[in-house]
C-alpha cells in the first residue's frame, strides 16, 4: 500500500508506504483465520456486509499520528486475539476489521492530500480498490477535499497484466522505451529517491 504523487509518466514521489504488512495481506490473513477461503479480500467483504462495523474494538495503527505511513501488523494481531476470544461472530469481526482498515486508509490519505501543493485528483487502484466500502470512503474523502475521484472498473482492479500493459503503453506513447539489454530487477521502486522507512516497508 503506497500513496504516490504522480507527476508524469514514470515520475512518482512517494508520500507514504507500508512499514510492515500490506493491507491486502491483512485481508488475506483475516480470511484465512476465519476460514473464509481465497481470495481473501472479496471473502472478507462479503462476510462484513452482514456485520456491525463498530462492534469489535480494534486498533487503528498510526491513525492521527504525524507519521504518514501505514501499519497493519498490529491490526492483524488484534483480529487474531479477538477471534480466539470467542466473543464475536465472523460477520461482526470482519465488519469491524474492514472499518478499521478504512479509517486508517482515509486518515493517511487525508494527510497526504494536505501535504501536496495542488493535488488534481484522488486515484485509487490495485486489488483493495475493488472493495466497495473502501472505494466509497475514499470517494467521500475526495469530495470533502474538492477533488475528482478516479478508480478503475472493479474487474480491472485485480488484473496485474492490465496494469502493467497500460503503464507500458503510456511509456511507449511518451517515448520512454528500453532495449532488451537491461537486467531483470526483482524490486523496482516507483520512487527511487524515497527514503527507507522503519520496519519492513523498505521494499518500497
Q: How would you name each of these model-derived features?
A:
Residues 127-128, 154:
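Active-site metal-binding loops of divalent metal-dependent hydrolases
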Residues 21, 96-99, 155-160:
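Short, conserved micro-motifs enriched in small and acidic residues
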Residues 1-88, 170, 174-186:
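A short helix-loop
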Residues 152-190:
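Glycine-rich phosphate-binding/hydrolytic loop that grips phosphoryl groups
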Residues 121-122, 139-164:
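Conserved phosphate-binding/catalytic loops in two-lobed NTP-binding clefts
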Residues 3-6, 133-135, 161:
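Short glycine-/acidic-enriched loop or helix-start segments at secondary-structure transitions
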Residues 46-122, 131-145, 192-204:
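A contiguous, well-structured pocket-lining segment that forms one wall/lid of small-molecule binding clefts
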Amino acid at each position: 500500500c503506497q500513496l504516490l504523487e504522480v507527476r508524469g509518466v514514470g515520475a512518482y514521489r512517494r508520500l507514504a508506504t507500508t512499514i510492515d504488512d500490506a493491507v491486502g495481506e491483512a485481508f488475506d490473513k483475516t480470511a484465512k483465520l476465519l476460514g473464509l477461503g481465497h481470495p481473501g479480500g472479496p471473502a472478507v467483504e462479503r462476510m462484513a456486509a452482514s456485520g456491525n462495523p463498530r462492534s469489535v474494538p480494534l486498533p487503528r495503527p498510526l491513525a492521527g499520528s504525524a507519521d504518514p505511513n501505514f501499519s497493519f501488523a498490529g491490526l492483524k494481531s488484534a483480529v487474531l486475539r479477538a477471534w480466539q476470544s470467542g466473543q464475536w461472530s465472523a460477520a461482526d469481526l470482519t465488519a469491524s476489521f474492514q472499518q478499521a482498515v478504512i479509517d486508517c486508509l482515509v486518515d493517511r490519505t487525508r494527510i497526504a492530500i494536505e501535504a501536496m501543493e495542488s493535488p488534481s485528483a484522488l486515484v485509487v487502484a490495485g486489488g483493495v480498490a475493488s472493495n466497495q466500502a473502501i472505494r466509497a470512503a475514499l470517494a467521500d474523502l475526495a469530495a470533502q477535499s474538492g477533488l475528482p475521484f478516479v478508480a478503475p472498473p472493479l474487474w480491472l482492479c485485480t488484473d496485474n497484466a492490465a496494469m502493467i500493459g497500460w503503464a507500458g503503453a503510456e511509456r511507449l506513447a511518451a517515448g520512454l522505451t528500453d532495449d532488451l539489454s537491461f537486467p531483470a530487477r526483482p524490486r523496482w521502486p516507483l520512487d527511487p529517491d524515497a527514503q527507507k522507512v522503519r520496519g519492513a516497508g523498505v521494499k518500497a
